[in-house]
Every structure is written in C-alpha cells, then in structure tokens.
Amino acid sequence: MTLPLPVDLSGRSLLRVGDLVPAEVEAILDLAGELKHDLTPRLAGRTLGLVFMQPSTRTRLSFSAAMAQLGGMPISLRSDELQLSRGESIGDTARVLSRYVDVAAIRTLSHDDLETWAEAATIPVINALTQAEHPCQALADALTIRDRLGGLDGVRIGWVGDGTNVLVSLAGLAALTGMRVVAACPSGYEPPPGTPVELVRDPREAADRADVLVTDIWTSLGTDEEAAQRLRDLEPYRVDGALLATAAPGAVVLHCLPAHPGEEITAEVLYGPRSAVWDEAENRLHVQKALLALLLG
C-alpha cells in the first residue's frame, strides 16, 4: 500500500534550502526514513531527467537509484550530449525537457543558470548542486545526524575549513531545525554574508564540544587553478584525531565526499569509528526518494 504523503510539495521546485519551511523539512526526513524500507513503486510510469554540467558520482547514482527504486525511470544526460553545447538556450532546453520528463535534477555551477532552468520549465526542478547551494546534501546530513543522535534540536555542528556551498545549505537547514553551526574558516574563505553561522578563525573553537564535526574538500568545483594556494591557506584546518578529541563525547564526523585523505581530513578520522560519512552518502538516496515522491505528489 502506498504511504500517504505528509505534506503537499506537489509541483514545486527545490533550488535552495530556504525554499522549505520547518514542517516540510521534518516531513521530508520522516518520509526518507520510511522509504529506506518501503520500496512501493509509487512513481511507476514517471520519468526523471538528470542534466549534469559537471562530473558527479554520488548525486548521479543516488538520483538514478532513487527513481528506479520508486518504480520510475531515470534518464541521465551530460552537457556535451545536449544542444546546449552548440548554442541552444537553457530556456528552450528546459521547455523541451518539460515535455518529455516529469521532474528534472540539474547540476550546474551557476545558480543563475539553475534559476533560468526552473523559470522556463513547467515541471519541478531540483538543485543537484550549484556553487551557491547543495540542498540535497544538507537534507542527507540532517537525516544522518537525526539517525545517529536521535534528534536535531539543540545539536551543535562544528564546521572546519572552506565556507562552501555545502556549509551554506547545512547552515540554512540548521536554522530551520534548531541546530547551531559554528564555522572555522580562514580569512577569504568565509561563507557568503547572511549565512546563519557563528564564524570563528580557530578550528578548535568550532570543534569544542561539537556534536557533529563537518568538513569539505579544499579544492572543489571551479577552484583547480587556485589549488596550491588553497592548500597552503587551509593547512591548519585539517580534521584529525586531535581536533576530534576536543568535540563532544560520541560526536560524529560528516564529509559530503569526495575526500582527499591527508588534506582536509585524515584517513584515521575518515575511516574511523566516529565517521558517519558512509551512512551520510547512503542517505542521499533516501532523502532524494522522499523529494521525488513529494514533488511528484
């Protein structure tokens, strides 16, 4: 039997965490937990279009598996397989895509381009990562924290390193769910103004008594030319055993992956007993199943 949907998100897009209200976040996480075990083909006959302007491992695989587990069909396309690469506009591509599929997940560095996709499309559009935000990752992080710690309200998150799009989305979600984020970022690597974090410079301040310790890759999408300088600037912000020891007893470690062990995180921590990284990666699948089910009603 198909489970009733807890909120009505039918027909909506998800471009930023701020598109959601607290009750909707809770409903997505609750449904994601249920869909870990319920494989009812509720989206049989529906189609997901995946458009990736940048490489992807987890996002492409998890969205494809999510749609398949719900009984639907995923179709994945790279930018070089589309007429976009030969000058067709995003708007026209979105209008055509809307005639063939029921929902689209788009990965593109430019958030403005994502908004153009959503404005032209007549189907729900999901942000599968832009330089501005990564809302699906934030939802997976929240599900992982809730699974590990039993709840979200009052949880202290320590972020260490570059103030990336992942931090922006995680901080936005924390503000909706009663969590607090303390972010240690070097000068020049802060998140955008208005991001709801307590900003510090010393990584030990972020890690101190944190229930969750989070980091991200130092050389992310669009930053390869700056790699050498970034490695020098971020060297003091590595998550290692000594830093983890200052966190709360039972604290867990998150990383959205891919990871570079020895740079932003040591292998000891990444593969250690307090790492929830692999559960976090799996939970991308489950929160995206919930999103697809809710957006398609």
Report residues per predicted region.
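Phosphate-coordination loops involved in phosphoryl transfer and adenosine-cofactor binding
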Residues: 42-48, 153-155, 250
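Adenosine-phosphate binding glycine-rich loop
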Residues: 250-251, 256-297
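Positively charged, low-complexity intrinsically disordered leader regions
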Residues: 1-61, 65
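Phosphate/diphosphate ligand-binding glycine-rich loop within oxidoreductases
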Residues: 35, 43-146, 261
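Rossmann-like adenosine-cofactor binding region
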Residues: 194-268
